[in-house]
Amino acid sequence: HAYHLQQAVERSEARAAVVVLSSNFVQRGEPALQDKWSRAETALRCGADLVLELPVPFSCHNAGVFAKGAVGILASTGVVTHLSFGMEGEIPEMDAILDILLHEPLPFKEKLKSVLALGMSYVEARANAIDALLQGVKDALSTPNNNLALAYLLEVRKRRAPLEITPVIR
């Protein structure tokens, strides 16, 4: 995370870095390895200027809800101009993917419904449904970092949040 913070500040030319961290509980309701105070202190030592807590109802949920909370917090400050997150690699089709998820065309809905009926997880089924429309993107949508990146981008678009996107490739 220190590398990510350094890269985000460098790429955005930010004068200050605001970090949103999960509470004491993380995805699936599991306790964090370190308490929120220790993690906030570490973030400050690594260069963050302000650390804000992502409340438990967001931090324990899926990527979409997690992103909704984080983007909401950052956008509501009125001072944050950039959003940085990690990705596993560039996804050239990202705008087309976001358009599909925002507008949910009928072929997407039908494919999603059919693959969910096979017992796939929602994330896997969504990747398959998008891949049916934009062949070759399923693998890129199957990694946790890219899934969260997609959730952040989708939330920024839904809110029309004035945040410039600064991804860091891991």
Regions found by a protein language model. Give the residues of each.
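Active-site cores that bind ATP or allylic diphosphates and position pyrophosphate for catalysis
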Residues: 53-170
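Trp/Phe/Arg-rich N-terminal binding region typifying the photolyase-homology
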Residues: 22, 37, 45, 60-61, ...
